[in-house]
């Protein structure tokens, strides 16, 4: 088997990692912060020029969750799978008091409660650039 790097148009930040790797029928998705292309571009530019990291923009938490989950879906789809084939998800929230809002949106990305993956959710001491959350996942290709 050969490791395959999955590209799906999800904004990359020039960090020393791939966002998604497929190995055989397994999919590994790195922690995804809610970075849209505009912010990711500013981050790449700052890193390339050795400048300070730009502050994370003031984006409503609901929008941050949708950015992360949309990017996860894009990566899963590009790997030849679907959200219902995720096996394990790890969620870091900046503020645990936002768990209900997160859960409401998160559930909408799966076809039923039976297809929800195993999951760990915790409050992070600090998230990337102080954004509201980061989510990583492991899944399979049916």
Model-predicted segments: where are they?
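N-terminal presequence-like segments and the immediate start of the first folded domain
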Residues: 1-70, 74-88, 93-142
């Amino acid at each position: 088997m050969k490791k395959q790097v999955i590209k799906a148009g999800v904004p990359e930040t020039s960090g020393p990692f791939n966002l998604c790797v497929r190995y055989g029928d397994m999919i590994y998705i790195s922690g995804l912060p809610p970075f849209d292309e505009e912010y990711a571009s500013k981050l790449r530019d700052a890193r390339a020029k050795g400048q300070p990291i730009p502050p994370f923009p003031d984006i409503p938490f609901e929008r941050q969750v949708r950015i992360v989950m949309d990017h996860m879906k894009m990566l899963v789809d590009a790997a030849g799978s679907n959200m219902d084939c995720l096996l394990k998800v790890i969620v870091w929230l900046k503020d645990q008091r936002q768990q209900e809002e997160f859960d409401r949106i998160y559930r909408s990305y799966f076809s039923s409660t039976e297809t929800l993956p195993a999951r760990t959710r915790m409050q992070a001491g600090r998230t990337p650039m102080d954004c509201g959350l980061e989510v990583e996942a492991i899944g399979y290709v049916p």
